[in-house]
């Protein structure tokens, strides 16, 4: 999530050649140091978004914005994640803008997430826009370790190239929220009971998302939405910060 794939591959090759984990250890420490210590940080949601996009959707991250930080306490404006894929039918290159929102209230989380993703996936790349800056970052700091792929991607991302018209914008959303269904005592509820409880609520959650999508006028655009119910979003943030601090 935090380190460009090319650097990771180089460190792994160094270990194979020398038997030393020095470079991998240095990258690990560098990655840990890039996370902010701010209590209201959204980086926990962004990390989960990255994991879901790569693991479940098989969409590789195309740019490591964390690695561009000059100060760990700062945040980059623009999308929370930028991933890449190819449509199986049209063979178009698809750029997936990612947004994550963690709020205690589900309605607010959905509202904020759709409000943020809308201008990204409908953008005409107006001058000075956050998404235009992300496109510039893609051109300069592309997270690939394949020269041919890098060259092809640059053509897809260049408005002056004929291939630019084959680029399609899509979205990935992660919506985290509080829910009271989790047990507060040992052995009070098993995993099957919890799954059943969530399943009973899914239709209502889905309808809320559809309503917001229509209101944002992004209906018809390909959009993956992950809903993550937490016992407490605030507790998750604190636990993540504590873990990253080695506590």
Regions from the PLM with identified roles:
Residues 186-247:
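Extended, charged low-complexity segments
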Residues 87-93:
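Short, solvent-exposed loop/turn segments that connect beta-strands within catalytic domains
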Residues 111-192, 196:
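Acidic, metal/cofactor-coordinating or nucleic-acid-engaging core segments within structured domains
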Residues 1-40:
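Interdomain/boundary linker segments immediately adjacent to catalytic/signaling cores
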Residues 53, 80-83, 95-102:
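Conserved catalytic cores of phosphodiester-cleaving nucleases, focusing on short active-site segments
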Residues 47-56:
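Amphipathic alpha-helical segments that form well-ordered structural scaffolds
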Residues 74-78:
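A short, glycine/Asx- and small/polar-enriched loop/turn
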Residues 57-73:
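A short acidic/basic microdomain associated with nuclease active sites
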């Amino acid at each position: 999530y935090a380190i460009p794939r090319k650097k990771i591959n180089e460190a792994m090759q160094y270990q194979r050649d020398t038997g030393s984990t020095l470079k991998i250890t240095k990258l690990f420490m560098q990655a840990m140091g890039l996370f902010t210590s701010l209590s209201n940080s959204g980086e926990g949601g962004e990390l989960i978004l990255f994991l879901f996009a790569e693991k479940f959707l098989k969409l590789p991250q195309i740019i490591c914005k964390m690695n561009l930080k000059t100060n760990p306490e700062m945040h980059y404006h623009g999308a929370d994640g930028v991933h890449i894929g190819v449509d199986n039918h049209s063979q178009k290159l698809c750029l997936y803008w990612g947004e994550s929102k963690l709020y205690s209230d589900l309605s607010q989380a959905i509202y904020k997430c759709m409000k943020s993703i809308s201008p990204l996936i409908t953008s005409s790349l107006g001058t000075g826009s956050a998404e235009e800056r992300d496109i510039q970052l893609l051109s300069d700091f592309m997270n690939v370790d394949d020269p041919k792929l890098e060259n092809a991607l640059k053509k897809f991302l260049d408005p002056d190239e004929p291939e630019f018209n084959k680029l399609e914008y899509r979205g990935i959303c992660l919506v985290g929220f509080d829910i009271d269904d989790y047990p507060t005592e040992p052995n009070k509820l098993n995993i099957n009971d919890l799954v059943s409880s969530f399943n009973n609520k899914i239709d209502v959650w889905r309808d809320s998302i559809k309503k917001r999508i229509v209101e944002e006028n992004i209906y018809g655009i390909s959009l993956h939405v992950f809903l993550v119910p937490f016992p407490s979003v605030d507790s998750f943030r604190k636990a993540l910060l504590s873990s990253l601090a080695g506590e």
